[in-house]
């Protein structure tokens, strides 16, 4: 069965050349017209002009432009991952006198009356209008083509499908595709006093209003007993403009498993700080396992409060830009990586994954354990990316940490960097694509990203060991001790052990037992055959035979700020 947010348009009239026009009564849209509603919200790049509506040709969304002339004379949009299709353009305007929406579309020689042409007309497809409608199962549906709005953490976060601030949903065996913004939302409820407040009120930055909305949610019933504990499994999620799955607060204690998440934000017609295959804030005790992420503008983005989060047994590849021409400085470049963990205090466990994109992990964070992974990309943004971008004044970002396995807030703190563990990983340096080198030149070394393209733990060189860190606090440290208060703001320790490095991947300087193989050339990649993906590599022929240490909760210890162990959600 199909649940669609779109309707067929079949009254096309030829205008000129490849351009056709059609009129639709605004009565079709009810009280929500996607063609008078612009995509907007906190952390959306304002220079992008896009309506929440879309036009689809045979199920594929076309490219909105801002004038009729751009429909008549379309140009290739080089930021898109699918440039050839970008000349299929559309423009819309309102006929106020007739109360109609007028479409102008370039079909590149096709007769739209002989093809399937649809426009999305509904904001959601399967989504309660009220909060608190829990314990619903959606199984085996095709859900597609809704006119969803941008879903930042400081707004009412909607998707085509979602539980709308409730508990215990199961979304399984569904195909979720072609949402204007987000496919599935496990997101925040509407707080009328704090809904895109940064955009609307302007006087408080979004980082502050986000802290405010978290505290407000706690006062208004955000608890383990009321919210979250959803399951998303075995879904095919693709071709959405912002995210495949989005969430803030509402996704706590959930399981996201065995999904295929791909081709997200490939059109590059939306840009901002909320884009990825999955983008979740406050993924407290969320388990993300056995998913396949590929061809996304970033695979998985865990932002703030990835506390008790586990990312395990996933396959990631092709989640960085294909070519340098796809980079867009106006859109924060959107270079992408497999996993981005941002200003969280942990504990976040990343284990038994295969990460094959050019950039494996962006780690502007602390409290992360990276264990038993096969990694063929680089670590970026280590030791940076945690301030708020002020030009001249200090702008540290304070983020919450919580009572272990609960939503109640225990405190707020900046990110000091470090407090990370790297055990028993295989690092392989892939050949660096010319396009990635050009992107690095284009974006440079900046506050948010260092552009590193070398695999391995070398970005953590110079971080203290636990023994070095503890030694700084020897003796009395209280008032009048003579010790500098800087002690409490210096980098935290990093633990390393059992890692193997091939093809020029580099270990951190302080790693004592690193195995660095400079003799053998390792090949690695993935290949699709008959709908199945295979890992092709010769690394198994050259792995050292020495035994690695068994890694356990006791080995990993606790994340510094929340003082919480790396343990299962049940403690």
Question: Language-model segments: what does each one mean?
Answer:
Residues 49, 84, 120-122, 155, ...:
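Residues that act as N-cap/strand-start positions at coil-to-secondary-structure junctions
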Residues 393-403:
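Leucine-rich repeat domain C-terminal region
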Residues 386:
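Glycan-recognition and catalytic cores of secretory/periplasmic carbohydrate-active enzymes
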Residues 134-147, 167-181, 193-213, 224-243, ...:
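Right-handed parallel beta-helix
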Residues 130, 153, 163, 224-225, ...:
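Residue-level marker of regulatory loop/turn positions in helix-turn-helix DNA-binding domains and
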Residues 1-165, 170, 175-177, 185, ...:
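Extracellular polysaccharide-degrading/modifying enzymes targeting complex plant/algal/animal polysaccharides
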Residues 125, 158-160, 182-183, 243-244, ...:
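Structural detector of coil-to-beta-strand junctions
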């Amino acid at each position: 069965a199909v649940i669609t947010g779109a309707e067929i348009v079949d009254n096309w009239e030829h205008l000129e050349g490849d351009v056709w026009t059609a009129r639709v009564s605004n009565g079709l849209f009810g009280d929500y017209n996607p063609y008078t509603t612009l995509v907007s919200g906190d952390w959306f790049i304002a220079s992008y002009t896009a309506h929440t509506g879309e036009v689809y040709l045979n199920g594929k969304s076309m490219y909105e432009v801002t004038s009729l002339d751009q429909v008549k004379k379309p140009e290739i949009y080089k930021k898109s991952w699918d440039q050839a299709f970008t000349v299929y353009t559309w423009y819309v305007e309102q006929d106020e006198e007739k109360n109609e929406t007028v479409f102008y579309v370039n079909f590149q020689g096709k007769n739209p009356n002989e093809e399937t042409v649809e426009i999305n007309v509904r904001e959601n497809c399967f989504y309660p209008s009220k909060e608190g409608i829990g314990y619903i199962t959606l199984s085996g549906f095709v859900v597609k083509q809704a006119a969803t709005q941008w879903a930042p953490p400081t707004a009412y976060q909607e998707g085509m499908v979602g539980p709308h601030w409730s508990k215990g949903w199961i979304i399984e065996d569904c195909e979720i595709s072609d949402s204007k913004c987000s496919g599935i939302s496990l997101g925040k409820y509407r707080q009328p006093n704090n809904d895109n407040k940064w955009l609307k009120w302007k006087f408080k930055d979004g980082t502050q209003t986000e802290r405010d909305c978290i505290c407000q949610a706690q006062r208004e019933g955000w608890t383990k007993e009321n919210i979250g504990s959803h399951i998303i499994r075995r879904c095919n999620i693709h071709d959405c403009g912002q995210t495949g799955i989005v969430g803030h607060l509402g996704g706590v204690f959930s399981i996201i498993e065995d999904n295929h998440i791909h081709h997200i934000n490939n059109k590059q017609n939306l840009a901002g700080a909320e884009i990825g295959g999955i983008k979740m804030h406050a993924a407290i005790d969320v388990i993300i396992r056995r998913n396949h992420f590929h061809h996304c503008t970033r695979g998985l983005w865990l932002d703030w409060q990835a506390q008790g989060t586990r990312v395990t047994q996933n396959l990631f590849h092709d989640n960085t830009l294909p070519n340098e021409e796809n980079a867009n400085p106006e859109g924060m470049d959107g270079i992408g990586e497999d996993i981005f963990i941002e200003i969280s205090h942990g504990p976040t466990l990343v284990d038994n994954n295969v990460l094959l994109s050019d950039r494996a992990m962006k780690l502007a964070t602390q409290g992360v354990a990276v264990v038993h992974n096969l990694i063929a990309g680089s670590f970026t943004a280590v030791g940076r990316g945690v301030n708020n971008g002020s030009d001249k004044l200090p702008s540290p970002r304070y983020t919450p940490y919580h009572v272990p396995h609960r939503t109640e807030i225990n405190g707020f703190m900046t990110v000091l960097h470090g407090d990370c563990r790297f055990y028993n990983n295989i690092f392989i340096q892939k050949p660096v694509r010319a396009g990635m080198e050009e992107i690095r030149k284009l974006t440079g070394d900046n506050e948010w990203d260092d552009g590193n393209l070398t695999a391995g733990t070398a970005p953590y060189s110079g971080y203290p060991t636990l023994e070095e860190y503890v030694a700084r606090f020897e003796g009395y440290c209280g008032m009048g001790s003579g010790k500098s208060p800087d002690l409490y703001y210096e980098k935290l320790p990093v633990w390393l052990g059992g890692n193997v490095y091939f093809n020029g991947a580099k270990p951190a300087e302080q790693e004592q037992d690193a195995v660095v193989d400079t003799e053998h050339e390792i090949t690695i990649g993935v290949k699709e055959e008959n709908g199945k993906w295979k890992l092709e590599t010769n690394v198994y022929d050259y792995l050292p035979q020495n035994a690695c240490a068994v890694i356990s909760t006791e080995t990993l210890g606790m994340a510094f700020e929340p003082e919480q162990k790396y343990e299962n959600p049940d403690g």
